[in-house]
Amino acid sequence: MPSFISIQNIIYPSNELSLTMILLEEWSLTYVEGIDSKKYLQGQLTIDINLLLKTHHTLCAHCNFNGRVWSTMHLFHYEKGYAYIQRKSVSQIQIKEICKYSIFSKIKIRELNSICLIGFAGCNVRSFLSSLFVKIPNQSCPVIHEDNKTILWYEKPSERFLLVLPFLDFLTLKRKINQNIFLNNSKQWLLLDIEAGLPVIDKICSNKFTPQAINLHNLKAISFKKGCYYGQETIARIFFKKTNKYFLCFLVSTGSIFPKIGSFIETKVDSEWFKVGVLLSIVHVKCEEIYIQVVLRKSVNINNLFRIHGFENIFLIKN
């Protein structure tokens, strides 16, 4: 039986991406069930869960008492409760923290290790998925449930989809593919998230930033009208007093470097370099370019030259 799937080891920006299936091994799925799940999540997350339709998913954050982000996640209705997708490196500590106050609630929170997260993106991706599924999500209905499979629709940086399905169903899906498609790892999805302006919070950067510092207020991931939730006092104060001093952006350079996540970002003023930000994520693109997502001080000149502490490669802010 011929294989239509070709391994791809090069990461491409969205405007150059061929039809690609992406294994999201760096992300995880957490499931929340129980009669108190809605009420409990309402007191923990930054969005108003009462407004979340069953046909939609939403970006949000889980913060500590001081308004620092443990993790960012995409939340949606799933089976008998809710599920959210977050970075795998932070899932264990995030689940531990969100369970701390659940002893008196009828709720169960756990990571679903038996579920596969598979991305689809690139040229003609909608047409491709339409040959495999009866319904495909879109802007008006970004979440579709079909049997025991769920498909999420993402608009930016270009139309893409995330499939949530059991491993055996993934194997069945692979056997049904009858047209050429590339297979890549989660770095490809990471790049698409960076291009889309979605903050990437791994374990090393957990518990360091407020939601506003990573642009969640502009991504409609914070509700300022709901009742109390963890971190609300700090988050609301920053919003109403306009005291946020940071912003999320992505920078580009060339070369091949491997800095640690959490490294300092420096900018050049006159002849000296000063620390002005923190590295959240990095992807090597087409073997020659480097894309990084960073948190910078708002006071910085966006036309400046930047570098990662300990490396000489010069970065510029991507417009």
Curated annotation (Swiss-Prot):
What are the leading ranks of the lineage?
Answer: Bacteria, Pseudomonadati, Pseudomonadota, Gammaproteobacteria, Enterobacterales
Q: Which UniProt keywords are listed?
A: Cytoplasm, Folate-binding, tRNA processing
> Which InterPro entries does the entry mention?
GcvT/YgfZ_C (IPR029043), tRNA-modifying_YgfZ (IPR023758), YgfZ/GcvT (IPR045179), YgfZ/GcvT_CS (IPR017703), YgfZ_barrel (IPR048451)
The Gene Ontology terms for molecular function here are: folic acid binding
Subcellular location per UniProt equals: Cytoplasm
Which organism is this entry from? Buchnera aphidicola subsp. Acyrthosiphon pisum (strain APS)
Instruction: Provide the protein name.
Output: tRNA-modifying protein YgfZ
Q: Which GO terms describe its cellular component?
A: cytoplasm
Record carries keyword Cytoplasm: yes
PANTHER family tied to this protein: TRANSFERASE CAF17, MITOCHONDRIAL-RELATED
Residues at which folate binds: 27, 189
Q: What is the documented function of this protein? A: Folate-binding protein involved in regulating the level of ATP-DnaA and in the modification of some tRNAs. It is probably a key factor in regulatory networks that act via tRNA modification, such as initiation of chromosomal replication.
- Origin, by domain of life? Bacteria
Keyword check for Kinase: no
One record GO biological process: tRNA processing
Which NCBIfam families does UniProt cross-reference here?
PRK09559.1, ygfZ_signature
Q: Name one Pfam family in it.
A: YgfZ_barrel
UniProt record similarity statement: Belongs to the tRNA-modifying YgfZ family.
